[in-house]
A protein has these predicted regions:
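Hydrophobic alpha-helical membrane context
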Residues: 15-16, 78, 280
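Structural motif marking the loop-to-transmembrane transition
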Residues: 2-3, 61, 113, 117, ...
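Bacterial N-terminal signal peptides that target proteins for export
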Residues: 1-9
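Protein maturation boundaries and topogenic segments
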Residues: 3, 20-23
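Bacterial N-terminal signal peptides
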Residues: 8-17
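Hydrophobic alpha-helical segments, especially transmembrane helices
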Residues: 4-5, 67, 247
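Active-site-adjacent loops and short helices of periplasmic peptidoglycan-processing enzymes
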Residues: 22-181, 188-192, 209
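Domain-terminus/edge residues, biased toward the C-terminal soluble/receptor-binding domains
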Residues: 160-164, 172-391
């Protein structure tokens, strides 16, 4: 009887040990079906692409072009070539092409009046005002045409390979195109380079000329983690939305182009964000300054050994629960010779996940090591000589 109970207990133990890993695994469903012409989901910190479809297809940008307009304005302010409180004269041209008499989105600016740069930025970002975008373009570059050239130069600097700007508004123009991937790039740049102005994208209303207009980004009302960015719509482009949200310290950017309606672009964007936050994590796997290699041999130095570290955080975006499967491979220079300067690159950290290379990071000297005295150097030289002869 005792043997029978022992055998039964053993079977139960084996069954539990086999079943437990299945419960601990995170199941990831198929990618969500997105009803749009093109889309992409990226992590804003690491640039990791989580989902994409037709992300490099050139499509009309609609008002998403205004993201570059406000990015350049922010750059001009940061470079002190422009001030927030600078007064901008609203031209007849800005009023005619983008004002209240048009069918497009407008800030309802009055011609030949003056409005501050900061108010115009609010009008572009929140109200998607075409008149405000044209006024800013003319103020900075003299004409909207010249400003579009600045936009294209900036796009090239940022690596936006499939974008061509012809105006500051995104109003239809033959040959004016962008892509979902490029929109992810400019959104990342706005968040990274100008956080002081990014908060404008989260505002739900802005009032000018006693007219209070809502932000057209529906996700601002539906999801407290969403804090930007921009909507766009023309008959040619369809309904577009670049959105961003932050949860658990992780920021994602979703781009949806060519949806069928205002509701659809919000719904499809929410699908992307929800999928990304549920099934991915962005974490610092190695903090800056962490010692990753101890006792690296230093020849001809006043000290014999040196620690190697990393200069910046190693941040990765990986499927949730897969962090334990990360593999780190450390390669150190074959021969480290003094003098060594703190921060000098002396090796590489290779990180992979399930055989896929994720990142290569330089390993650097933790501190400086000067040359040793002449006799110590001679001693090391003799040891190295014999080592080479024997090998």
């Amino acid at each position: 009887m005792a043997k029978k109970w022992l055998f039964s207990a053993l079977l139960i133990a084996i069954a539990i040990s086999l079943a437990t890993p299945a419960y601990s695994q995170i199941l990831r469903p198929a990618e969500p079906e997105i009803a749009a012409k093109a889309w992409i989901l990226i992590d804003a910190t690491t640039g990791k692409v989580l989902l994409e479809r037709n992300a490099d297809e050139q499509l009309p940008p609609a008002s998403l072009a205004k993201m570059m307009t406000t990015y350049i304005v922010s750059n001009e302010i940061a470079a002190q070539r422009l001030q927030e409180d600078s007064e901008v004269l609203i031209s007849d041209n800005a009023w005619i092409l983008g004002g209240a008499k048009t069918d497009g989105s407008t800030m309802f600016l009055s011609p030949r009046t003056k409005v501050s740069v900061l108010d115009l930025m609010h009008g572009v970002i929140i109200q998607s005002g075409n008149d405000a975008a044209i006024a800013l373009a003319e103020h900075i570059a003299g004409s909207e045409y010249a400003f579009a050239d600045m936009m294209n130069q900036q796009a090239e600097i940022l690596g936006m390979r499939n974008t061509e700007y012809l105006n500051a508004t995104g109003l239809p123009a033959a040959g004016m195109v962008t892509s979902a991937r490029d929109l992810g790039i400019i959104a990342s740049a706005i968040i990274r380079d100008h956080p002081e102005y990014y908060e404008i994208y989260a505002k739900k209303y802005f009032e000018h000329n006693n007219i209070n207009q809502p932000n057209r980004n529906r996700l601002l009302w539906r999801d407290n983690s969403v804090d930007g960015l921009k909507t766009g719509h023309t008959s040619e482009a369809g309904y577009c939305l670049v959105s961003s949200a932050k949860r658990r310290g992780m920021r994602l950017i979703a781009v949806v182009m060519g949806a069928s309606s205002d509701e659809s672009r919000a719904r499809e964007s929410q699908k992307l964000l929800s999928y990304g936050f549920r099934y991915y994590d962005t974490k610092v796997v190695y903090p800056a300054g962490e010692i990753l290699k101890t006792g690296a041999k230093v020849w001809y130095g006043a000290e014999e050994f040196l620690n190697l570290t990393i200069a910046e955080d190693v941040t990765l975006t990986v499927p949730r629960g897969s962090e334990k499967n990360l593999k780190a491979n450390i390669l150190v220079s074959d021969l480290i010779k003094a003098p060594v300067t703190a921060g000098q690159e002396l090796g590489q950290l290779h990180v992979s996940l399930d055989g896929e290379a994720l990142v290569d990071i330089p390993l650097v000297a933790e501190k400086s090591i000067p040359k040793a005295g002449i006799f110590s150097q001679l001693f090391d030289w003799i040891i190295l000589l014999f080592t080479r002869l024997l090998s």
